[in-house]
């Protein structure tokens, strides 16, 4: 699985066990990602922070 890094032009191959790509952003600014990368379990979103997870190459 390949996931985008914070700079969308770059991607990285996920290590074993981390089979989800995620994008984290502030609810107040939904079009500005704060973090991107590989993760094993999708974190729960909160009132301030939203997580979007997916399991295909560069879907974040």
Curated annotation (Swiss-Prot):
Keywords: Cardiotoxin, Cytolysis, Disulfide bond, Membrane, Secreted, Target cell membrane, Target membrane, Toxin
A GO BP annotation: killing of cells of another organism
Localisation per UniProt entry: Secreted; Target cell membrane
PROSITE patterns: SNAKE_TOXIN (PS00272)
Gene Ontology MF: a single term: toxin activity
Presence of keyword Endoplasmic reticulum: no
Tissue expression from the record: Expressed by the venom gland.
Main location group: secreted
GO cellular component, one term: extracellular region
KW Membrane (keyword) present: yes
Cystine residue pairs: 3-21, 14-38, 42-53, 54-59
InterPro entries attached to this UniProt entry: Cytotoxin_Cobra, Snake_3FTx, Snake_toxin-like_sf, Snake_toxin_con_site, Toxin_cobra-type
SUPFAM superfamilies: Snake toxin-like (SSF57302)
Family (UniProt): Belongs to the three-finger toxin family. Short-chain subfamily. Type IA cytotoxin sub-subfamily.
Function: This three-finger cytotoxin is a basic protein that interacts and penetrates into the cell membrane, with the tips of all the three loops. Cytotoxins which have a Pro-30 (P-type) interacts with membrane stronger that those which have a 'Ser-28' (S-type). CTII interacts with membrane stronger than CTI.
Subunit description: Monomer in solution; Homodimer and oligomer in the presence of negatively charged lipids forming a pore with a size ranging between 20 and 30 Angstroms.
Protein's UniProt name: Cytotoxin 2
Species of provenance: Naja oxiana (Central Asian cobra)
Taxonomic lineage from the root: Eukaryota, Metazoa, Chordata, Craniata, Vertebrata
């Amino acid at each position: 699985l390949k996931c985008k890094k914070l700079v969308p032009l770059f991607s990285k191959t996920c290590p074993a066990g981390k089979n989800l790509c995620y994008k984290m952003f502030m609810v107040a600014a939904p079009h500005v990602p704060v973090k991107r990368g590989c993760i094993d379990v999708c974190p729960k979103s909160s009132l301030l922070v939203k997580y979007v997870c997916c399991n295909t190459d560069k879907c974040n």
